[in-house]
Structure formats: structure tokens, C-alpha cells
């Protein structure tokens, strides 16, 4: 009996460190056919560099869309049904939120898991090679090195809008995931970082600020049409 309990505990532990495998299954109450908008967003990545998942609160934007796709690209562990963009080797990526606190409590949590239990988020535990703490922000991570199935490594850096546009200058990126709406100047700066790599821009947010320039651009609405 003790051996059986140990086996069950180990199985549970391994499943917790492969959270990504539980999303969008073929069948069951959470089968992927129930999420047509999510799948449409993923497919669009094969043709479009810039995408926005604009939706209400509490429908899985951050975890089921942003964190899920970002983790796939970082690891190269695409499911068989994936019809979106694929990267065949390690990448450089940013994930950014409104401020350091929300970045830690949302993006870091969704991708890595709880403090002291990294590997229980969307990035599989055995794919996380190294994490670097963020100076001056308790329990926050600045960067993560991730194993890619091609045999090399990906690197993810957590950033926040309150660092200002200048902090988004410099290095080229393959993926930039912006969770919550940023200012237009930050968006343009991030888009510039992906140009030489033909990289992807992902945005996930609820339009709490109304019909902003960014929302209008994605919806194809001109100011005269408002």
C-alpha cells in the first residue's frame, strides 16, 4: 500500500509539472472544440505577426492564450493539432505586464508556477534550466532559461510597462507577449524588436480603457467612424 501511495504521489507530481498537457485535449469536458476563438487566435499566428485576443475577464486570456502559446514557442513542444506558427530552435522572448507586481502575480505565476514550486506553471518543470531574480522586487524573476526540444535554449525576460519605453529598446526578440494594454509608444517599440526576426506580437487584454488607438488599429476603425 505504501508503495502504491508513493507511485500515486509521483504521478501527481509529474502531472503538476506538465500542466501544458492538460490544455485543449481531444476529448472530455475541456476538449478543444469548445474553444473555437482560442484556436482561431492560434491559427492566425501562421499568417499574422501581430495579434490581439480582446475579450472579457475570466475567460482564460492570460493562461489559456498568452502563457500557453508562449510556453509552446519557448520549448518547441507543439501538440499534434497545432496549426499556428512554429519555431524550430530556441528563441528570445519578452513577457510584459502593467507593473512589476502584476507581472509577478500574473505572468510569472502562469508561466512558472508558485514561488518555491517553479515548474507547475505552463512551462514544464523539466524544461526550466535556470531562473534569475529581479533586483529590488521580492519573489520576482527577471529571466528564465528554457530547454528547447531542438537541443538548444530559449530565454524569456519579464518586463513591465512602468519601466518606460526606453527599457524596451535594444535586443531583437522572436516573441513579445503583452498582457494588459500598454501605451502606443511601448507597443511600437516592441514591434520594432521583432522585425528582424519576423517575430510575433501577442496581446491579451480586456478593453478597460475603451476605444484606444491600439484597439481601433486592431478593429480597423478610424477616428471618423466613432
Q: Where do the protein language model's features map onto the residues?
A:
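Phosphate/NTP-binding elements of NTP-utilizing enzymes
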Residues: 1-226
Amino acid at each position: 500500500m505504501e508503495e502504491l501511495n508513493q507511485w500515486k504521489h509521483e504521478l501527481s507530481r509529474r502531472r503538476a509539472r506538465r500542466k501544458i498537457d492538460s490544455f485543449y485535449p481531444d476529448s472530455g469536458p475541456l476538449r478543444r472544440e469548445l474553444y473555437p476563438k482560442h484556436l482561431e487566435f492560434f491559427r492566425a499566428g501562421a499568417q499574422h505577426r501581430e495579434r490581439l485576443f480582446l475579450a472579457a475577464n475570466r475567460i482564460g486570456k492570460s493562461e489559456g492564450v498568452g502563457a500557453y502559446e508562449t510556453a509552446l514557442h519557448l520549448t518547441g513542444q507543439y501538440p499534434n493539432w497545432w496549426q499556428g506558427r512554429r519555431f524550430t530552435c530556441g528563441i528570445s522572448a519578452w513577457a510584459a505586464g502593467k507593473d512589476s507586481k502584476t507581472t509577478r502575480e500574473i505572468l510569472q505565476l502562469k508561466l512558472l508556477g508558485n514561488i518555491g514550486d517553479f515548474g507547475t506553471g505552463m512551462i514544464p518543470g523539466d524544461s526550466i534550466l535556470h531562473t534569475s531574480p529581479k533586483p529590488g522586487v521580492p519573489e520576482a524573476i527577471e529571466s528564465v532559461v528554457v530547454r528547447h526540444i531542438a537541443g538548444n535554449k530559449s530565454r524569456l525576460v519579464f518586463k513591465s510597462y512602468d519601466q518606460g519605453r526606453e527599457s524596451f529598446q535594444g535586443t531583437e526578440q522572436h516573441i513579445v507577449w503583452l498582457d494588459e494594454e500598454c501605451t502606443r509608444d511601448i507597443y511600437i517599440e516592441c514591434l520594432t524588436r521583432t522585425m528582424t526576426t519576423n517575430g510575433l506580437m501577442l496581446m491579451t487584454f480586456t478593453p478597460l480603457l475603451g476605444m484606444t488607438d491600439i484597439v481601433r488599429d486592431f478593429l480597423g476603425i478610424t477616428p471618423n467612424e466613432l
